[in-house]
């Protein structure tokens, strides 16, 4: 009898319907590169986490785990990668190793984005110290 109760509990937990939070939807295969406040991970593993809640289209996940519109991202709810800083209005012409001082640039505001911190430049997916750029 005890084993039957345990098996019933295991089956109930395994087949339970997951409830998603506001602005989320249940997906059969979760994308581990889910867009977040400030950035979308570009280097991530390809794996499928089944029956998980993803942010609905048009929403991103903040550092508190909530799905919000990009306009709702703030410095406090955004966790930027190493050597990056949150900008409410970032540049469309971020400095890179190849172009450390971009001169020709359209005036665009990239809203609520993580970009390289002062003294760092973009090199591939990361921000590195200017002096560490390949020669």
UniProtKB/Swiss-Prot annotation:
Domain TIL positions: 20-73, 80-133
Pfam families according to UniProt: TIL
Listed GO biological process terms: spermatid development
Entry-linked InterPro entries: Ser_inhib-like_sf, SerProtInhib-TIL_Domain, TIL_dom
One function term, GO molecular function aspect: serine-type endopeptidase inhibitor activity
Tissue: In male, expressed in the vas deferens cuboidal cells and, in posterior body wall and male-specific diagonal muscles. In hermaphrodites, expressed in posterior body wall muscles and spermatheca.
Record keywords: Cytoplasmic vesicle, Differentiation, Disulfide bond, Glycoprotein, Protease inhibitor, Repeat, Secreted, Serine protease inhibitor, Signal, Spermatogenesis
Leader sequence segment: 1-16
Subcellular location: Secreted; Cytoplasmic vesicle, Secretory vesicle lumen
Protein's job: Serine protease inhibitor. Probably by inhibiting serine protease tyr-5 in males, prevents the maturation of spermatids into mature motile spermatozoa until their transfer into a hermaphrodite. Also required for efficient sperm transfer and thus for male fertility.
Protein name, UniProt field: Serine protease inhibitor swm-1
Natural source organism: Caenorhabditis elegans
Taxonomic lineage of the native organism: Eukaryota, Metazoa, Ecdysozoa, Nematoda, Chromadorea
Gene: swm-1
